[in-house]
Amino acid sequence: MTAQKMTAQEIIAFIGNAVKKTTVKVTFEGELAGAVPAEVTKLGNVLFGDWKDVEPLLANLTENVDYVVEQDGRNSAVPLLDKRNINARIEPGAIIRDQVTIGDNAVIMMGAVINIGAEIGPGTMIDMGAILGGRATVGKNSHIGAGAVLAGVIEPASAEPVRVGDNVLVGANAVVIEGVQIGSGSVVAAGAIVTQDVPENVVVAGVPARIIKEIDAQTQQKTALEEALRTL
């Protein structure tokens, strides 16, 4: 699925101009005294909508008055991504905001957090608990390890986002600082903190990360992707 590519200023405007909503699901007993407005969806004894539209209905319940409110945000500006038509494997518990691009056969594991404006290429895996900040970009057939962070940039608007190339492996709990670019074919070792651009086809490790060697056949074998994990 390809979302419209947004600049930092466009994302800021999108958030600033968005109608802020506190979306709720309310299960109630009793009868609603008033008409249900168009902004609220009623299915049996369940209401879905913004709290400001739902609350007045609950105030006018008659007979066996009781209800339970479920919510997961307050004055939210950015909805979660509608994942129904995405040609990728997205596991339960991944948090993906709207205006994110996810390529075919990508894999998003449970606990991953992907912010507005991020781009994930075809065949790329975002592992458990990894974080892609706003506008972070990952190319095709890459792997972002569990707990890794690609720092996001929405403000200041002038800053550059993280860009990761194709066929890159970022190890578990590594951190890539704002504006850094990781060249295609490179490997970032687990726990590394990357503060400078990384050229293509090298291995970096350490705090701060430094080049420790060029990619060789042994490294390629150890970091090879498993296509079966990307089969839908």
UniProtKB/Swiss-Prot annotation:
GO MF: tetrahydrodipicolinate N-acetyltransferase activity
Q: Does the keyword rRNA processing apply?
A: no
| Entry-linked HAMAP family | DapH
**What's the stated role of this polypeptide?**
Catalyzes the transfer of an acetyl group from acetyl-CoA to tetrahydrodipicolinate.
Q: InterPro entries this protein is in?
A: DapH, DapH_N, Hexapep, Hexapep_transf_CS, Trans_hexapeptide_repeat, Trimer_LpxA-like_sf
Q: Which PROSITE patterns match?
A: HEXAPEP_TRANSFERASES
Which NCBIfam families did the record assign? DapD_Ac (TIGR03532)
Which EC number(s) does the record attach to this protein? 2.3.1.89
Q: Which reaction does it catalyse?
A: (S)-2,3,4,5-tetrahydrodipicolinate + acetyl-CoA + H2O = L-2-acetamido-6-oxoheptanedioate + CoA
Name of the protein in question: 2,3,4,5-tetrahydropyridine-2,6-dicarboxylate N-acetyltransferase
Q: Which family does it belong to?
A: Belongs to the transferase hexapeptide repeat family. DapH subfamily.
Pathway(s) the chain acts in: Amino-acid biosynthesis; L-lysine biosynthesis via DAP pathway; LL-2,6-diaminopimelate from (S)-tetrahydrodipicolinate (acetylase route): step 1/3
Keywords attached to this entry: Acyltransferase, Amino-acid biosynthesis, Diaminopimelate biosynthesis, Lysine biosynthesis, Repeat, Transferase
According to its UniProt entry, the protein's GO biological process terms are: diaminopimelate biosynthetic process; lysine biosynthetic process via diaminopimelate
